[in-house]
Every structure is written in C-alpha cells, then in structure tokens.
C-alpha cells in the first residue's frame, strides 16, 4: 500500500528508549536530533514537479560534546505520494523506477503525508531539535521544506534552517574543496554498508550511516596542508 504505515512509525515517541536522557527532557542543554532524508521526484524543482516518495530515518543525537548514533537504523518513515501537477521528466522516472500513473491512483494525499511526517519527526525528537541531514543537502531540503510549508498542517518540523549538509562536513574534515567531496570520493572507512538503490527509505538509511561515520571521523593524516 502506497501510504504505508510501518511498525517503526506508529505511536508517539517511538525512539525515545534509544535516545540519551537529554533528548527525553531530563537535561536542559540543547540537543540536536538528526533525521536523514531522501526524496524521489519526477523533476528538478518542487511546484512544477512532484515528490513521488520520501524516506526519513532517525540518525542520532548531539549535545555539543557527545554524538550518539543509533544501534540500528530502524526508526523510519516512508510514504509514496500523489503527484501534484501534470508535468514530469522521463529521465527522473527512469532513475527512481516509480510508476507515476499508479501513484496518481494510489499515492497518499500530500497534505496527510506531510502532516504525518511532521508528527512522526516531532514525536521521535521529543525535547530535542529536529535537524534534517542529507548528502548533498540542497536537493532534498528544497523539496521537503517546500512540501512541509505548502502541505503540512504544522509547517516545517525543521523550521527554516535546522539542517546539516553531510557533503560540507566531509569537505571540512578532509580539507578538500566541495567539488571534490562527492560520495564517490569517500575513503573506505566512511563508506556505508547499505547500497544506493534510489529507493527513498533505503537511501536515507545509507545516508544516515555515512553521516554517523563522518561525524565520528577523527582524521589523523591527510596529504593537504590546512
């Protein structure tokens, strides 16, 4: 069913038992709760084109000193969404393999999909601040922020700027230009166990693994002079 409600996205505070006390409200310091996101679309920009599916996975917390990655990436949210316009690009459909005609019939209404996603994010984050992470951030953020503002009854759970670009983090830690910070340039120690499949949820999990690997990466040597 396209509007799939998984066991992982049912109920309030589904990940609270896996979060540090700071996230559950037992600590007054600000805490980030990270959510890796991936979208599959039928074109390059929201509005004229549509989100066809999106996936979210809880990706860890950070209190300014300690990063805690999940033991398992099993706190997830996935929806397939009804297109909002008649425009699409065949190349985009070839990449993600989604049946746009089926989604016109069976896809979830974007208003309910985005409102449910916002509720799930806020429930998992608890008292922490939800932060969207992606590699690169620009594409997924542009789509999800537009869709949350346009369709969610609660607006954006990430406000207008609570976001983290994994590509920039890698470039800074590796002391390389952004142009050289593609996923293909990741050293073996930072690569994920999951494969990139162009399924939104699977790619969000893959991305969450990369995010945690880079966040915890202590670079000892590098060929460049800072």
Language-model features and meaning:
Residues 38-40, 140, 165, 203:
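Acidic active-site catalytic centers that drive phospho-/nucleotidyl reactions
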Residues 1-4:
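Methionine residue identity
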Residues 131-138, 142-143, 182-226:
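Acidic, Mg2+-coordinating catalytic module of metal-dependent nucleases/exonucleases
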Residues 138-161:
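Substrate-recognition/cap helix-loop segment adjacent to the acidic, metal-dependent catalytic center
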Residues 44-46, 171, 209:
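Conserved protein kinase catalytic core
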Residues 12-138:
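Conserved non-catalytic scaffold segment of RNase H-like nuclease domains
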